[in-house]
C-alpha cells in the first residue's frame, strides 16, 4: 500500500472548500448560484427536497430507489473464513465487511444482476455475487477468494484496506453501468451501488457583503474524518460541518456582487447514504506513519445534526462492521475486521479464523474504517434473514454444494466458482467438526482396528493421530501475515509419517480428500482424538 494507489479517485473538489478530502466516485459535480437574501432563501424545506432530483434527472434510472430486492435465501449464521494467500489480509478484511452489508448481500443472493448481465467478460458484480453466495452458505469452512476480486490491484505486498475497499466499490458501480463508455454522470448516481453507499454533500457559501448564497452539491461514497484533534467520531463530524471563515487571502470572489469579500462556508450532508463508510484518517499521506490513538465510536449514531435540513426527526444508524489495522505503519502490520452477522451477535473475522466476540470488544478497537447502516434499512433487510432457510451444518453433503455451483454457472458465465468449491476446507480443530466425527463413529457398533503410526511423545498415551503434522515442535513462529492458522488449512500432500485408519472412517476420509484435492501448498492439519 503506497502512494501509487490504483484507485482512480481524488479529493472532493468544492470551489471554495478544502477541509474535506475523500475518495471521489466521479468528477461530476453541480453548482447552483442563488441571488436571494437569507430571509428569502430558496433553500426552503420544499425546495431542498427537489435539489437532488435536479442533480439526477430521470433520463435513465438504473436502480429505482426503494426497490432493492430482499433475498429469502440468506442464512442466519456466520459464513466462511477466508484463506490468506500471502499479504492478502487487507482483501479478506474488506470482503468480510462487504459480505455482511445487508442491502448488498441480499441483492447478490437474489441473483438479479447475473440473470441480466450482458458483459462478455467477468464483471465485479458477478464475481462478488459468487463470492458472497459461497461465503454465506459455507459456515464453518475456509474458502479462497477468487483472484479476479483483486485483479489489477494486488501486487504481492501489503496494501491499504481503504484503497482496496473503494477500488471494489467503484468497480461494482462501473459494472452497473451500460457497456458503452459515454454515460451521463446523472445516470451514474442512480446505480445500485450509489443507492446503497452514495449520498450528497452540500457546500454553502454565504457572501458577507451582499448576503448572496452559493450552493455546491457533490456525491460521495465514503466520508473521511480528521481525528487529529478529535476524541470521538461525533467530535470529528462536528468539526467537519463547522462553518469556515473565508477572509484575507482566502476571501471569496462572489459571483453576485462581483467583489472579493469575506464569506462563510458550511458543509452539510444534503442526503445521507443507506450505508455510511466512515474512514478515520490514521495514516499520513507522505510517510505513511500511523496515528495510533483511541477514537470513540458509538454503536448507534444519529446523523441528523450534520444534515442540511434540521427540521426532521433523528436519523439513526447502527454499527455493523469495523475494519482494524494492527501495526505502526501503513506499509506493514495486519488487517482484520468485526462484523455483525446476526441481529445481536458479533464475530471477529481474522483471515481463516472466525470467533464470537462481544460488542464491548468491538467498541474498544482502534478502528480504521467504520460501517454504519440506517436503522430502518437494517430492520427491513434483517427480516429476510429470519425468513431465510436454515444454514447447512458443518460437513454437509458435497452434492448440495455442487448443485449450487452448477446453478450459478447456468446463470452467467462469470459465475464460474470451481476454485471456491475445490478450496473449501474443513476447520479440523473446531469443536463442531470433532462432534461430527464422533457421531459417525457411534453409527457403527463394531469399532475398527486402527493402525496408528508413531505418536509424538508430547501427546497423551491414548491419543489417536488422524493427520500427522509435518511441522515439528521446534518450528519457528511465523509472521502474523504468514500464519492464517496452521490448523485451519489442509492439504492432500501425503507424507511418510501419515497413517490413516480404515473402516468406518472411510467415508469421512473420502470426503476430506475431495474437499482438499487441489490445495497443494497449504499446511496439514492435526486432529487429536482422546
UniProtKB/Swiss-Prot annotation:
The listed locations are:
Nucleus; Endoplasmic reticulum
What terms describe the molecular function in GO for this protein? Answer: cysteine-type deubiquitinase activity
> What are the catalytic residues?
89, 334
Function noted in UniProt: Deubiquitinating enzyme that removes conjugated ubiquitin from specific proteins to regulate different cellular processes that may include cell proliferation, progression through the cell cycle, apoptosis, cell migration, and the cellular response to viral infection.
Recorded family membership: Belongs to the peptidase C19 family. USP17 subfamily.
Q: Where is this region: Disordered?
A: 382-411
- Judging by the UniProt lineage, the source's domain of life is Eukaryota
Q: Which CDD domains match?
A: Peptidase_C19E
Q: Which UniProt keywords apply?
A: Apoptosis, Endoplasmic reticulum, Hydrolase, Nucleus, Protease, Thiol protease, Ubl conjugation pathway
Q: Reaction catalysed?
A: Thiol-dependent hydrolysis of ester, thioester, amide, peptide and isopeptide bonds formed by the C-terminal Gly of ubiquitin (a 76-residue protein attached to proteins as an intracellular targeting signal)
Sequence ranges assigned to domain USP in this UniProt record: 80-375
Give the GO biological process terms: apoptotic process; protein deubiquitination; proteolysis; regulation of apoptotic process; regulation of protein stability
Protein EC: 3.4.19.12
Keyword Nucleus found: yes
Per the record, where are the segments of Basic and acidic residues compositional bias? 382-392, 398-411
Organism encoding this protein: Homo sapiens (Human)
Pfam families referenced in this protein's UniProt entry, alphabetically:
UCH
Protein's name in the database: Ubiquitin carboxyl-terminal hydrolase 17-like protein 1
Q: Which EC class does it fall in?
A: hydrolase
GO CC, sorted alphabetically, is: cytosol; endoplasmic reticulum; nucleus
